[in-house]
Structures are given as structure tokens and as C-alpha cells.
Amino acid sequence: MLNLIPDAKTKKSFTDYLIRTLLAVVAAGFNLMPSLNRYLKTEEGWLDFTVGITTENESVACAIVFAGGKAKVLGEIPKQAEVVLIFKSDAAVKKLLGATPTDQIFMLLNSELRVRGHMGYMNAFFFLLSVLMNKKQISQMKKERAVSKKELLKSEPEKRKDLSDELASRRRSRLKAQNTDANVRYLDDPYLSSFTIEDFPRLKTFLDAHLSAIPEVCPELPSLVTRWHKQNGFETDKDGRPWQPALRKAHAYKYLMENRRPIIAENSLLAGTTTSRPVGCIVYPEGSGTLIWNELFTIPHRTHNPFSISDETRRLLHFEVFPYWNRRNFREWVREKYSNPLCQQIDERYALYFSWKQATISHTIPDFPKILKLGASEMIAQISAEMEKPERDEQQRANLEAMILCLEGLCAYSKNLAAQAKQDAEREANPVRKQELEELAKACHQVVEKPARTLFEAVNAMWITWIGLHMESMNAGLSLGRLDQWLQPYFLADMEKISSPEEKAAYIKKAIELVGDFFMRCTDHFPLTPDLANFYFGGSSSDQALTLGGVTPDGGDAVNDMTYIFLKVTEMLSLRDPNVNARYMPEVNSDTYLKRLCEVNLITAATPSMHNDRAIISALSPMGYDIRDIRDWSATGCVEPTLSGKHLSHTNMQMMNMVAALEMALNNGRHPLTDWQLGPQTGIVENGDFRTFDEFFDAFTRQFAFIIDRSIEYNHMLGEAHQYLRPTPFLSSLIEGCIDKGADVTGGGARYNSSGTAIVGLADVTDSLMVIKKLVYDERKVTFAALKEAVDTNFENDPALLALVRKKTPLFGSGSEEAVAMANRVAKWAHDYYDAIPHYRGGKYTTGFWSMSQHVAFGTLSGALPSGRLRGKPFTPGLTPQPFASPSLLDNIRDVARLDP
């Protein structure tokens, strides 16, 4: 019989007894109740794993073991336990017992709870607990949502009619313009001011549905790829031979594309859907898919970004999909191969950096013009010719064969769509819709196998290819590129066939509707994120960046008819995805174009993002890229520049909390929130170890270098995991360089390779360093020890010092030359350090200073700073100065503009 009484010899607490008692209840439930026990048996067999529970001082140390369909409790933690939950204290353990799911997330984020070992088994364990406690958890979550709604209503009790009236007024007060752009051939009023959303009932219906849709977890992709792998093997094939990774992926991809449902969305002009649901969340099992295992019952009830899920999807994911992929995903592959390395442990504490390669490597832009101009059949012919070259080795031939298999799969899907469109047309009673479906069937017989001939075919080819790319790579940051440039030739070719002004006007309206339909199709999917990510990233969308305007590869004006058509659609729909970016080149692009960008941004109150072409080209030029390719850049994901169709830039490989390095420098290498003596010991402030400001700056950079080195180490390991678990042969066929090299894009096949980091907290670090330099060393108004004590106590005991910091120190954004120089010093150090690190795919590591919504998450996980920012408050977003830096917005703008590109 299990002894549940605390053992004084082991110094275990009463909490240990309490936890063992509760675990015994859990074990009894799964042992005695068939309705619970059935969840322990999956297609892979019994769920066999051990979960340990302990505290930092080991006052609690016990485990629950699931094996052979039975559960038992141990009074110790076996060495072979798959996962151990480590609580900061007994109080934290007790807190978890009454915690809501949201409370549990914040316990992880705030280091009251950390995890050692296999995250998948942790999620499986919490799923089993949710089976047992389903009703209680759902009740808690409903209460949380009610409280959240109440708080929101308290902050804004009534609808802001003044704001909605203002936006409506902006939409009514649209500008007109005469065409002044040399490459705009057919738009007399390039602003297309006569059109409103009311002129496009199809688009208005789509938009209304989008604004009320709740995404649903879609099981199609994981079901099909899991089925194929179970039949054909993963590590080895049916005959026991090791799979070549790209070939394995390509065969599975082809099976997926041949067997997924060909759906024509209701009333759409475009063929195909990203998922089998009207708006679906794709489960990528080798990426981050298994992270929602613990939420299969609760995901419809969470406060932020709830997703619906059917009973059948829940059953399929738990019993068939997740057990198969539990060890075959990026995170766990690295953990097993490299024995839970320190770099991974740091990432899983959430407060220092986050590595996106745990989920995807998809921040890039495919060469869409290639498939539009050649069609898949000609691409296959070219790749086949490359395979026959005598200098090709076995690995290169396998990679090239994998590209062919993927292109064949894409063609099969397009043919299936053609057949579906034909069937839908035969059943359609409305003659107008019937004709549209018949045209769709014809288009899908032409593209993607053959070149596009019309704008209608080109947009359909784009969309089908886009679906195909998202069947291979996660829908996060994969971007669309310069669609106005790539679609303009088809627009011109169509217009040249039309003679009468009336027909041309009707065609322009149809082109607007077609592009609008494309925008709305891009909203038919949503990233599948665990609830923790909602607090970490703020519910980010897929970030499908689209880029307009700027200059051509030759340096000429790139603004054309399609540029303005895309801007019209952007104005009317005002969507966050696609993420529209506009390039503007001074002295090349017209004032007409610039005014239109400003007008659309004003009407939508959000978009497009506007980029100075000259500054971006200047920033990219030192990288050694061909100038024509630099001029052809597009935004990726959020705003990051990538060379279109030639560059695996993975511009957002990681989110880096630079403030963590500052905190560690202030604490001799210890990270305060995690209470972890992590970095090098660089000096104790209280002991007066820093005689000069430069000595402290050196300590800061040493801590930052330590964090960067660990993050890059993890990035390399995850890159290796991608090469084995999920090479991307279809994407590789659309990135220049891969075919010539016979290499997958994950293995350095692209013509240009790089990875980019998003550094968060530049203004906060700069201001903190300015306070230390000016008040401690230059003016000697406060000792470093006194400043640190104020920081450690959140300035609660020294409001006078807080006022001095905020009002008497020249901060970034105040107009101070010295503050700008400090910001440039910090940014240059980061740039130079990353630039010197060898890249596993070749190329460079690049730096950027933007934050998505990470400035909030990292700020929540950081203490007070010398800058006067208080504990838990958000950092400033991107390059934005502190709000108290200056009363003048112009000072803020000028200081940001004076940062070195």
C-alpha cells in the first residue's frame, strides 16, 4: 500500500502529502473508470510516461506513472521520468491547485513553475487532467471570459460613436487624382474614388462573414500526413531503409495534395481553400501542433482567440496524430539529440528569447513569377534535365526528385479543383454563378500546370500555389511579395484585348473584385497557437506580407495600374491580413502615389505600412547582394526586407529580450525573474566593481553576448531538426539557387541565405544606460548602489530619484545627440556581434529592432529599470521612444530617423 504520510527524513512538506493524495485520486480514476481509461490507449499503443512533481528545495518530490493502461503514484521521482514540473515553492504548488488555466500560464511565464524534460508529455498529462476536470475547467474559463468582458466594458462602457463616425467620414471624403505615373496605363483616376465596398456585394458578403467567423481546428492535414507516414514509415521506409528526408517529405506532400478535399468557397472567383473549414486553423504536427494537446477540451472556451473544435477532430488528434508526432517534432528532436541543452532550457523560461524555428522557418518570399510564366510542367522538365547532369550526386538527385514530386502533387490538386468546379457548375441553378464555375474549371485545367494567360488565371495560379505552400510550411510569415509587379503584365494583356471604354471600365471593376476576393481568401486560415502564445504574442495573424510600389530592379518607377488596384482593395476591406506594405522612393515615385498611400492609411487607420526605399536599399547594400536583387526587395512577415524569390532570410528567427542582458549585468549574471545564475559573473554593483561607465557597458555586452551565443546555438540545432524532420522541397522549387545546387532551401539551397533577429527593448536599454552614465558617472548625483536599490524596489522608496531619472536625464527621443549616440552604440554592437557569427546555411545573421507585441510580454517578465520604467510594464514597441522622453513628437521622430541604417 502506498505510504502517503510525509517522511521527516526527506524533509518533505505537508504539500507533498497533499499532492500525492491528489495524484492517487487521478490514478484511481484512470484505473477504475473505463470512460477515462480509454484515453490512455492510442493507435501507437498505451500512453506510457512518467511525470514528476517537485519544488526547488525538494520539499515536494513525487511522481505519477502511466504504463500499460494503468496509473500509479510514487513517493519519489524516477531518473527516467519523461518530464518534471518544478515549482518555486510549496505556495506555488498550492496556487496551481486552485489556478484557472490563465493563472497556470502566468505561473509558467513568471517562473513560479518551470518544466524540465519532454514538453509533449507535459501537454499529454495536462490533457488527461482536463479529461478528469473538464467541467470545472470550462466553468472557470467562462468566468474568466465574463470578468474580462466586464473589465473591457468598464474601461469603455459605451461604443465610441465619435470614432466610428470619424472613420465613416474619412471613407466618404475620398480624394480624386489625375494620373501622373508613367506606368499607370489605364486608370484615369488612379485613386478609383468612384468605387466603394457597396459596389462589390460579393466582397461585402465575404467581409461580413469574416468579421463574425470563429476559426475551427482543421484535422485534414495532420490526418492525411500521419496516415501516409504510418503506412510508409518515418525514420525508415517499408523495407527498413533510412528515408532521405526530402523524398520522404515530398511523397507525403504529394499524397496530401492528391487526397485533400478540393473545395470552391461559396461564391468565390478563386478555386481552393487552405483548410476543409470555412476558416480553419492548420495543425502542423512536426512543428507546434502538439502544443495544443492539453487544450483539446478547453480551446473553445479560452478568453483570447478561442477556436472551435469538433468531437471527431479532438478524437483524431489525441488518439491518432499527437502520439505519433510526440517525439517527431522540432523541439523534442533537439531535446533528445542534444540532451536538453542549456540553450533550449533558456528558451523555455520565456523571459530571455524565443526561437521561431521551433514552429517554422517560413519567413521568405517564393518566386511566384516562375510558376506564372512557366507552369509546373515546364518547371518539372527543367528540374528533370538538372537531375540528368553527370556531376549530380545521389543527395542532389534526391532533392531534385523531391521538388518534382511536390510539383506533381500541386498539379493533381489543381486538376481536382477543375473537376470540382465542373461538378459545382452542373449543379448550379444561377446562370451567372454557373458561368463563373465553368470559367474556374477551365482556369484550373490551365494553371498551375501550364502558364497563366490572363489576370483571372494568374490570380488563381497564385492562390492555388499559396495553398500548396501552406500545406508544406506553417502559415506564419510566409509572404506574397510584389504582386502589383507580377500581375501587371496580365492586366495589360487583358486590357489590350478590349476596345470600348465601357468594357474597359467593367474590366477594371472586375479586376478590383478579383483582387478583393484574393484578399478575402487569404483570411480563410489562422495560425494555431496555444493559449500561452496569446499572452506572449498577442494573437498575431499569419502576417502574409504583400508589397507595392517602389522601384524596379533597374531603378525605375515601379508604380503601375495594379499598385492602385491593390490600394483600392486595401482601402475598402481594411484587413490586417494580407499585411500590405508600400515602398516609396523619393524623387522617383510620384506625389500622387505618396498622397494615395497616406489617404489609404488614414481611411483604414492602420495600413499600408510605408517604407522609404532609399533607406532600405542603403541598409541592404553592405550585405553584398546584387543591386538589382536589392531593388527587388519585399517585406516579409511584419516589415522585414527580403530579396524576392531568391532569399531564405528567416527574418524573424527569434525574439530577443535585450533588457534581460541589462538586468543580468546589474545582477552579476543572475537573471532576476527566473532567479537563475545564468550568465558570466561580470561584477557586483553594490561592491563598486564598475569604476567607469565603459566598464559597466562592457559587462552589459558580455551578458548580451552570452545570451546571443546560446540563442544561436539553439537556432543551429533547430535548423538541423528542420533539415531532417521537415525539409521543404516545394518551396525550394520556387527559390532561386536550390535547383542549381540540387539542395533543399533548409540546407542552404537559396541563392542568398541569412537569419534575422528581432531585438526588443532598444529604447529601454538606451535610456537605462543614459541614466547610469549621466547620473552615476558624469554628474555623480546618485551612487550606482543607490540607483540599483531603487530599481530593485521598483522606485517605491525613492520617488524623488524616479522624478530625476524621468525629467532630468536626456533620453532617446528627447532630441539629445548623446542619447542618439548611445542608441547607435548599442545597436552597432548588436549588429557587429551577430554579423560575425558563422551561419549554418551560409550568409549572415542580421539584426532588426521591432517587437510584434513582444514588448508587452518581455516587459511583463522584467523588473524595474534605471530608465524609470516600472516593474512589469511594457517596453516601448520597436524603436519608439519612452512617452516621457519629450513633450514634442518631432523630437521622437528626429531621434529615430538619426539611427544608423
Task: Identify the residue ranges that each predicted region occupies.
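Feature captures hydrophobic
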Residues: 1-171
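Generic structural signal for well-ordered, non-membrane alpha-helices
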Residues: 87, 102, 127, 412-423, ...
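Charged, alpha-helical scaffolding/interaction elements associated with membrane systems
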Residues: 98, 110, 427-429, 496-497, ...
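Hydrophobic side-chain positions on well-ordered alpha-helices
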Residues: 107, 421-426, 490-494, 775
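Conserved catalytic cores of very large enzyme subunits
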Residues: 174-399, 432, 436-439, 443, ...
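Extended non-globular scaffold/tether segments
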Residues: 401-412
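Short, Lys/Glu-rich amphipathic helical modules
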Residues: 419-437
